[in-house]
From Swiss-Prot:
Domain of life, source organism: Eukaryota
PTM per Swiss-Prot/TrEMBL: Phosphorylated on tyrosine residues.
One example of a Gene Ontology biological process annotation: signal transduction
Record keywords, A-Z: Phosphoprotein, SH2 domain
A molecular function (GO) term: DNA-binding transcription factor activity
SH2 domain ranges (all copies): 547-641
Identification of the protein by name: SH2 domain-containing protein A
Region (Disordered): 355-384
Tissue expression per record: Expressed in roots, leaves, stems and flowers.
Record InterPro entries: ConA-like_dom_sf (IPR013320), SH2 (IPR000980), SH2_dom_sf (IPR036860), STAT (IPR001217)
Amino acid sequence: MAGDCAIDTEKYSLLEDFNVDVEVENKAFETFSLCFWVYLLDSTTYPSAIIRQVHSDMSVSAPFLVLDENKKMMLLPLTLLHREAPDPVNTSSWTEVPNVSTTAKFPLQKWVHVGCEVSRNYMRLYICGELVGEQVLTSLMTNGTNSDCARKISLFSVGGDGYSVQGFIHSAEVLPSNLSASYHYTKDPPLWLSVDKPSTSGIELDEDGVWSVVSGTFCSLDVVLTNAIGQPVHKDVKVVASLLYADSGTHVEKRSDFEAFLLVSYEGIELSAEDKPCNLLNGCASFKFKLSQLSSKSDKRLFCIKFEIPEVKANYPFLETVTNQIRCISRNRDSVSSMKRIRLGEEKVSESKIVNGNGTSMEWRPQNHEEDNSSTDSENTEMRDSTAFRRYSIPDWIIFKYCLGNLTERALLLKEITNNSSDEEVSEFADQVSLYSGCSHHGYQIKMARKLIAEGTNAWNLISRNYRHVHWDNVVIEIEEHFMRIAKCSSRSLTHQDFDLLRRICGCYEYITQENFETMWCWLFPVASAVSRGLINGMWRSASPKWIEGFVTKEEAERSLQNQVPGTFILRFPTSRSWPHPDAGSVVVTYVGHDLVIHHRLLTINHICDSSERYTDAKQLQDMLLAEPELSRLGRIIRGI
């Protein structure tokens, strides 16, 4: 098992499997120290024996280390060494004999280091390397005892009876007299997975200790892998999240034809949490998650999120962790005020426009890296000046539901609308959403929905041939053919780096599923559609200069612009914008400002020219870009080897 995982699980064993023999010589014996890390599960009966003792003259074992009725740990004398040793049968004698006890309750479901130092005339108890007590005892060894006889005592744990606890033990060792318990405490601490304090954004802590989150809103928290003394552990492992009911601990099962209830964001792409493990980096995995389509009020239940390491196959509770109970609040409670905000269009984004002689305009504004939880992502207010509403077959509440929904909710709604509505009705729906939201780019995404879904379904059927999992190498050819056809550009193929980025967006490795493909397609199709139109098509075709160097991440662009002169810029398609986000398929300008800081601005081209103008318009867009005072020189992508 340990060979398949970066975590050596063979170091951890059940407490009931613990067994160690200690030889006690009559004259030469001085002292021994038994040290170990223990993780105790809850027990139903107290007092309970953690470790018991037995030797050849005993027919029944006696307790050595116990939890008393108050859950305090007690170290008891050895029957082979001390006159004060407890009666093996009479449990009441455990508290009557001299012992060493902790002053506080022993913590359960947590790693604790225990050290038991035993000599002829005393015993000491250490907790986490610190001495908590000492007891003077009377030795059974006398000078008249046969010095050639070495006695052995067995220390062990059992499970299943009424006087034992269940748990795990790590690094149990009998130390020689020259080594201390504090030495063992820092030698090889066990590992511990836990949830760090959540960020204040998106999570509220109620008075009852329950987290309150709004359904459909992204929240952030960190999961950390440390050792038991709090030091971060650098292991090449992944952590996966799953949603549970807080009362029963059972998984919240996905309903048929619905998206997963627990989603995570990876480079702006929403994925099912159970399908997208997160890498630990320097002992920490940062999760950006949201709960979708859930309400604690309607479901009458609280939830929690469980994090675990999938490579660890056995059930080790210390290598998994659960959040506080979560109260999921439906977004519908704010629907009235949200609809009013959308109608009034109170949220505006500052922008500057460049207009050329042909009436083509280009919006130039900061790129918003937040998730799409607002109704207006790209502002274009000319739709507000339209005439009164036309007679419309799709009801207003569907329009409001779309405007208020997140990306996943909008995608599901568009699939339903395109299946049950004509092209004219879909077009009218797009116009109405644009009018209510004040954002015409919503209309672009709605009008491409039918073609995006149909093309994507056809592409997957050709790729999969009814197989659930398809090797990535068999996918790339079909993806490239579809992209070049939709983009109306047969002269430029996708590169190896382009496919690497597409695979990252998919969230897959060697094999791709339909869910992986659909995630990628929702990003690729709007990009291909944008490339097919005049202004972008000419720039995509251009080889010298190469205005768009393929599919580029934000990090690659920033790295390429390090140490470049102000005004140097790179054009890229943002990986955080997927259909039906209103800015899907847009272009981002990443550039070095006069302040020597790298900036990102979203370039939204209105009234995009027909594809027949694709060759003549590249120069026009070039002039529009270079006319900006912040832009003066096209940069190049520098990728690591």
